[in-house]
Design a protein with these regions (language model features):
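Short hydrophobic "helix-edge" motifs at membrane interfaces and signal-peptide entry regions
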Residues: 7-9, 104-108, 153
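Hydrophobic alpha-helical transmembrane segments of multi-pass membrane transport proteins
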Residues: 142-151
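Juxtamembrane boundary at the C-terminal end of a transmembrane helix
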Residues: 180-187
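Hydrophobic/aromatic residues within the transmembrane alpha-helices of Major Facilitator Superfamily
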Residues: 8, 12, 16, 46-47, ...
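Juxtamembrane transmembrane-helix termini in multi-pass membrane transport proteins
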Residues: 2-63, 122-141
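Membrane helix-loop-helix hairpins that form the core translocation module of multi-pass transporters
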Residues: 32-101, 150-173, 180
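Short, structured loop/turn "capping" segments at alpha-beta junctions
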Residues: 85-91, 118-122, 134-137
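Selected transmembrane alpha-helices and immediately adjacent juxtamembrane segments
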Residues: 94-120
C-alpha cells in the first residue's frame, strides 16, 4: 500500500504544471471532447508507466542494494532540483490536428510527451525503490489521472486555484525526503 500511495502522491504533485498537464488543457480547449481525451491519457499513461515500471524493476535486480541505494538517493535529489524548474509547452496552436480522431491523438501525444518526463523518470525510480511493480504503476497512473482529468473537465480554472510554485516546492521537498530515506532505510 505504501508503494501505491507514495507513487500516487509523487506523480500527482509532479504533474501539476507539467507539460503533459498543459497538453491536457490544450487538447481540451482544441477539441472540447473530454471523455476521449481522458481515456487517451489513461491508455497512454498505462502503456508508458508499465514500460517505465518494468525498467525500474529490472534495474533493481541488476544492481546491488548498496549501489542502488546511492543511485536512487542521487536520482531523487536530482528530481527535487528538477521540480523547481517549471515546464513550458511549446505554443503549437497553429498546427493541424492529426486525422486519427481525438482519442488516438490524445494517446499518441501523451505517450510521446511522457518520454523522458519527470513522471516517467519518477516511475522508473519508484519501481526500483519498491518491490511492488503493480502498486507503483497503478499509483503513478492514478496520480496522472488525478492531475490531468480535472484539467480536461474543468480547464484553466483548476490550474488557477493552486500556485504552481508552491506545488513544485512541495514536490521538491518530497523528492528530497525520499533521497534521504533511500540512503538510511533498508530496501
Amino acid at each position: 500500500m505504501e508503494a501505491f500511495l507514495v507513487s500516487t502522491g509523487i506523480v500527482a504533485l509532479a504533474e501539476i504544471g507539467d507539460k503533459t498537464q498543459l497538453l491536457a488543457l490544450l487538447l481540451a480547449a482544441r477539441f472540447k471532447k473530454p471523455w476521449p481525451i481522458v481515456f487517451g491519457i489513461l491508455v497512454a499513461t498505462v502503456a508508458n508507466h508499465a514500460l517505465s515500471g518494468a525498467l525500474g524493476a529490472w534495474v533493481s535486480t541488476q544492481i546491488s542494494a548498496g549501489v542502488l541505494r546511492w543511485i536512487l538517493a542521487a536520482s531523487f535529489l536530482a528530481m527535487a532540483v528538477w521540480m523547481l524548474v517549471p515546464d513550458k509547452l511549446d505554443d503549437d496552436s497553429d498546427a493541424k490536428p492529426p486525422r486519427w480522431g481525438v482519442f488516438a491523438t490524445a494517446v499518441l501525444m501523451f505517450f510521446l510527451a511522457e518520454m523522458g518526463d519527470k513522471t516517467q523518470i519518477a516511475t522508473v525510480m519508484l519501481a526500483a525503490r519498491f518491490d511492488a511493480y503493480l502498486a507503483v504503476v497503478t499509483g503513478t497512473t492514478f496520480g496522472m489521472m488525478l492531475a490531468n482529468a480535472p484539467v480536461v473537465w474543468f480547464g484553466e480554472r483548476v490550474t488557477r486555484l493552486l500556485p504552481l510554485v508552491v506545488v513544485h516546492r512541495v514536490s521538491a521537498l518530497i523528492f528530497a525526503v525520499l533521497a534521504v530515506l533511500a540512503i538510511w532505510s533498508p530496501f
